[in-house]
A protein has these predicted regions:
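An N-terminal hydrophobic leader/cap segment in hydrolases
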Residues: 7-55
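Short beta-strand/loop motif that positions the catalytic acidic residue
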Residues: 208-210, 215-217, 221
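Catalytic histidine neighborhood in serine/cysteine hydrolases
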Residues: 230-251
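Membrane-embedded segments
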Residues: 60-137, 141
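Primarily recognizes the serine-hydrolase "nucleophile elbow" in alpha/beta-hydrolase
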Residues: 134-189
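Short alpha-helix in the alpha/beta-hydrolase fold that links the catalytic acid
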Residues: 96, 202, 211, 225-234
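Acidic catalytic loop of the alpha/beta-hydrolase fold
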Residues: 219-224, 248-250
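Post-His helix in hydrolase/transferase enzymes
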Residues: 252-268
């Protein structure tokens, strides 16, 4: 047997082993909850957080609701559901979302199954079930206008809110530093698409979503490349792309500009006045 045939055989074997390992451990890579741990994070003083638990068939998940500043004239106002990145917890994101409440928007943070104090195991199926339960609870609140529920996801959270948008109506989508889909991300590492267990196909959801979409992405993002953001923008029917000079974990670089852009988008979408 020629030497080159042996080398090809070894290469094929190595690739097969690589694919098997990726298939076996992909959820540990996508959902690195074991590396996060649980240590309480200091929250802003006097923040009126309502904490409660949501039950699904596979998990009991922690959720926090921050009511808006002031009350709408008719007693019902807009609300937002937030989904964090894969290496975060809801308490780490709470403080940075407070400006939404100053805009008159209630904020619901939903933990992923298996993260923090929530039970269960994270997967697209279990996360979607948790967010559907959260949405239904939020839409039933006496102080929430169900026609003005916004979905906001960052990084992996973009997949969570897109999966929710495929099952429940939303007034608008905000996708920050997120991907077109896990299969597209996996292809960078030569992983076959059929081996992806949790595809989070954001591109298909965005393409079919009829409402306004705000895409926020850093031009220098080396974790989820910038072209994912531009592809999502082109696929959406009504989308705005906010391109910032930043990477993945430092986006947005200018908080004041970011919140000005957010407020403008929400006004144009008819969420706030």
């Amino acid at each position: 047997m020629p030497v080159w045939v042996k080398y090809i055989g070894l290469a094929v074997l190595a690739y097969a082993v690589y694919c098997i390992l990726v298939f076996a451990f992909q959820r540990q890579m996508i959902f690195p909850r074991s590396h996060i741990g649980y240590a309480p994070v200091a929250l802003p003083d006097n923040l009126p957080i309502e904490k409660f638990w949501l039950n699904t068939a596979d998990a009991t998940v922690e959720s926090w609701y921050i009511p808006p500043t002031g009350s709408p004239a008719d007693g019902r106002g807009p609300a937002l559901i937030f989904a964090h990145g894969n290496a975060e917890r809801i308490d780490a994101s709470t403080g940075e979302l407070v400006p939404f409440t100053a805009l008159g928007i209630g904020v619901l943070l939903v933990e992923y199954p298996g993260y923090g104090q929530s039970t269960g195991t994270p997967s697209q199926k279990s996360i979607t079930a948790a967010f559907v339960a959260a949405y239904d609870m939020l839409a039933a609140r006496h102080d929430v206008d169900p026609s003005k529920i916004v979905l906001y996801g960052r990084s992996l959270g973009g997949g969570a809110v897109c999966a929710l948008a495929a099952k429940r109506s939303a007034a608008a989508l905000i996708l920050a530093s997120t991907f077109t889909g896990i299969r597209a991300m996996a292809s960078r590492y030569l992983v076959p698409a059929f081996m992806v267990r949790d595809p989070f196909d954001n591109l298909t959801v965005v393409r079919e979503f009829s409402g306004p979409v705000l895409i926020v992405h850093g031009r220098h993002d080396d974790i989820i490349p910038f072209h994912h953001g531009t592809t999502l923008q082109k696929a959406a029917r009504h989308a705005i792309l906010l391109a910032y000079d930043c990477g993945h974990n430092d986006c947005p670089p200018d908080a004041e500009r970011f919140w000005r852009d957010i407020a403008n988008f929400l006004r144009e979408a008819g969420i706030i006045v």
